[in-house]
């Protein structure tokens, strides 16, 4: 959900899209498609997502595409793709929302994204096949 509960975002891994749903009307109001030059459509599989607290920017993990899509959460337009590790899956914002950490299951690491700059700043090696990640609120 967006923080104001106006939209529910649902990823469709096999369908390759994110559906935008109006929870009050229980209808799909839009779909976000992802197109990365040089990659087959079936390699682009949206899975984990996160939306900033201000509701302006969304990040979508694209699985075997090894990318995180940056999406304008107001217009639903994809603004850029960030190259991360192999098989990006889940993500979590740090409590101060300065960073977004994403798990890369096949490369056994976590990519650190600077949220304001919208760029990958670090890769941290972790245990084998990481999939989930979370932070406790302070």
What are these regions (language model features)?
Residues 1-138:
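Predominantly soluble domains enriched in secretory-pathway, periplasmic, or organellar proteins
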């Amino acid at each position: 959900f967006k923080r104001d509960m106006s939209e529910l975002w649902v990823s469709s891994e096999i369908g390759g899209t994110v559906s935008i749903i109006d929870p009050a009307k229980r209808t799909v109001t839009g779909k976000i498609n992802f197109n990365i030059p040089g990659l087959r459509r079936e390699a682009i599989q949206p899975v984990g997502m996160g939306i900033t607290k201000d509701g302006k920017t969304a990040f979508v993990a694209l699985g075997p595409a090894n990318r995180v899509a940056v999406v304008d959460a107001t217009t639903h337009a994809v603004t850029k793709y960030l190259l991360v590790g192999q098989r990006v899956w889940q993500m979590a914002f740090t409590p101060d929302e300065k960073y977004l950490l994403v798990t890369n299951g096949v490369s056994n690491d976590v990519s650190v994204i600077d949220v304001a700059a919208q760029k990958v700043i670090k890769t941290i090696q972790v245990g084998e096949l990481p999939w989930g990640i979370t932070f406790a609120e302070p």
